[in-house]
Amino acid sequence: MTRTMVVTVRFCTFLINVDDEWDANPWLPEQVSLDPRPPLKHRPKLNFDMSAFSSRGMRLARTLQRRYTRRPLPTYQQPTPFTFRILPAEDREWCSISTMAIAENYEDVLKGKYPAKEHARKVAKWIIEKGGDKNGTIYLEAQKQKLNEDNDGEAPFRQRRYFFYLSGCELPDSYLTYEIPNDRLTLFIPPVEPEEVIWSGLPMSVDEAKAKYDIDDCKTTRDINAHLTSTSESAQSTIYAIPEQVSDNITFLSYKDKEFKQLKPAIEYCRVTKTDYEIALIRKANEISTAAHIAVMKAASKAKNECELEAVFLKSCVERNAKNQAYHSIVAAGENGATLHYVNNAAPISEQNLLLLDAGCEVDCYASDITRTFPIKGHFNEESLAIYKIVLDMQHQCINALKAGVLWDSIHELAHKIAIKGLLDLGILKGDADAIFKARASVAFFPHGLGHYLGMDTHDTGGNANYADKDVMFRYLRVRGTLPERSVITVEPGIYFCRFIIEPYLKDEEKKQFFDEKVLEKYWSVGGVRIEDNILITKEGIENLTPTPKEVDEITALVQSA
């Protein structure tokens, strides 16, 4: 016998048929209230049919699935007992969710202002705790609008992240000051230049900037030196700036002290932990990039060249008003996937089995970074499926091990140990697992770090990497140390069959004993498999910000659906 459970998630109500022998209490979160009937015995068997959903409906259903069951979603074509509709309030009688994941309702969060003042206070607090001047002033500059060399065309503009973090302002040629004792944030934007208006239209006005940004005052850039002089004379204080980001026309002469070493590390440290608004931006970037990844999966079987699929991804992002990419897309078919940062994206697609797509858009200076590997024609061959399952297991286990305070080095080690077990099972590696780990032989297949912080930069600040590490397993690990709550980190294990990397191991007297070259020969054509999600670290665990399909049945169904 089954019953219908009603669950409300983000203003929409789901009807789910569940097994009658269900004990909800052990697995529902505290925020869920159940109707007071006797507990049942087992978890519900939840099945989801996504085929008729809009993109928003799919997102809601995925939210529900992630929160209420650990079972993966089945293929989209399967009929299931799952239904979706809006119910009147009087019919919502089983349970409802009263709170959400952090910034899960990102559209609502982003209706507010970017929290520039909160960031400024956070940076000032760090400076003061390090012995800085509590009466000081922070000064930052936006990126200058530049022309391409030898012509009058404008170069692509990318806002300075240090400036944006304390302003939320995307305008070039701007300045800001933050007076620490007065908690006063002032933005300086370019004035109206009549000749420029002829070509580019009216720029943002001072009043518009005051309304848009989380600032206390706004002036034009003509006022910056007068403002700095008045601030320094009134406080006889210290100016904090980034030396290589101070224009020649700016004067700090009237300040008692000029401090050029603390501000940059202060901002880099503070950027590691994210506000709700920042998390909302990363969620939105992930949602847009997910739609683009799905579009590529659906287009893959008919593509003739990697560049066609890169175009599909870019088109999907731009259609959703995400015109900037967080990094150059990697669209690698077959053995091209063995090159970690392959960016040529111009090779023909013919007999290759796999496509590795590492691509993510940027939303208001915040990045997404997603990698999916899938069979171009919708069917894995034996070798590629075996490697894919190992990498997927690496990612699942590593994500499940995460929470605030976890040592990232240990998660990276876990990924290698899972890879070793999988490669031993396939016969690619041979011998004792511990001996293979100690010899670092698995680095031949997994040479990069497990992940990196994500935020305004794809490889975000604060990771404390040690690229001089003599231990090859950790040399390219971009994050060292423990993970703080509210940091966002990528988890991107991979296994690659790159001759340039592996062949030296086959010639090494100490390490060659661990490789079966005859078995290895069957796997060169796999190229590389990488799976990457963006993970928010919480006190008790994680929230996965990346809803992009990755289970075998999901991705094969999407490719075949074309």
From Swiss-Prot:
GO biological process: proteolysis
InterPro entries listed in its UniProt record: Aminopep_P_N, Creatin/AminoP/Spt16_N, Creatinase/aminopeptidase-like, Pept_M24, X-Pro_dipept-like
Entry keyword annotation includes Manganese: yes
Record EC number: 3.4.11.9
One Pfam family this sequence matches: AMP_N
Record's keyword terms, sorted: Aminopeptidase, Hydrolase, Manganese, Metal-binding, Metalloprotease, Protease
Obligatory cofactor(s): Mn(2+)
Summary of the function given for this chain in its UniProt record: Catalyzes the removal of a penultimate prolyl residue from the N-termini of peptides.
CDD domains, A to Z: Prolidase
Ligand binding (Mn(2+) 1): 369, 492, 532
Root EC class: hydrolase
Family: Belongs to the peptidase M24B family.
UniProt GO MF annotations: manganese ion binding; metalloaminopeptidase activity
Cofactor binding note of this UniProt entry: Binds 2 manganese ions per subunit.
Organism: Leptosphaeria maculans (strain JN3 / isolate v23.1.3 / race Av1-4-5-6-7-8) (Blackleg fungus)
Reaction equation(s) it catalyzes: Release of any N-terminal amino acid, including proline, that is linked to proline, even from a dipeptide or tripeptide
Binding site for Mn(2+) 2: 358, 369, 532
Database matches in SMART domains: AMP_N
UniProt name for this protein: Probable Xaa-Pro aminopeptidase PEPP
